[in-house]
Amino acid sequence: MNFKYIVAVSFLIASAYARSEENDEQSLSQRDVLEEESLREIRGIGTKILGGVKTALKGALKELASTYANGKRTAEEHEVMKRLEVVMRDLDSLDYPEEASERETRDFNQEEIANLYTKKEKRLLGPVLGLVSNALGGLLKNIG
């Protein structure tokens, strides 16, 4: 009698444990799915924000470039224009990375390419913000 009781209790414990493991796996997979959906939403929002910022920045840079292009330029303004053109090319290369990498890889080896991309990442935001602030400052000086 004790043996049958022990077997029955062991069977109940094993089945309860199996059910709890199954429930844990289901809840983990549901959490994973929810986390993945959240990450996709966040990435989508981030991509939209970045796209909007890039579009606004490109528009502002084009406006500044046209402002500088229409009038007579000093040497300093000419240098600013050249920098704006470089920034515009960098922004365009972000939109079409395959074409940019093909152009850039024609004459470089792999180590130089890695250094080039690292430098491009470092030099993109600093000069863009500097140029925009300098250009806006110059425009405000000219207006005022």
Curated annotation (Swiss-Prot):
It comes from Bombina maxima (Giant fire-bellied toad). Maximin-1 shows antibacterial activity against both Gram-positive and Gram-negative bacteria. It also shows antimicrobial activity against the fungus C.albicans, but not against A.flavus nor P.uticale. It has little hemolytic activity. It possess a significant cytotoxicity against tumor cell lines. It does not possess a significant anti-HIV activity. It shows high spermicidal activity. Maximin-H12 shows antimicrobial activity against bacteria and against the fungus C.albicans. Shows strong hemolytic activity. One of its GO terms (biological process) is killing of cells of another organism. This is Maximins 1/H12. Disulfide bonds: none annotated. GO terms for cellular component: extracellular region. Expressed by the skin glands. Residues 1-18 form the signal peptide. The modification Isoleucine amide is found at residue 143.
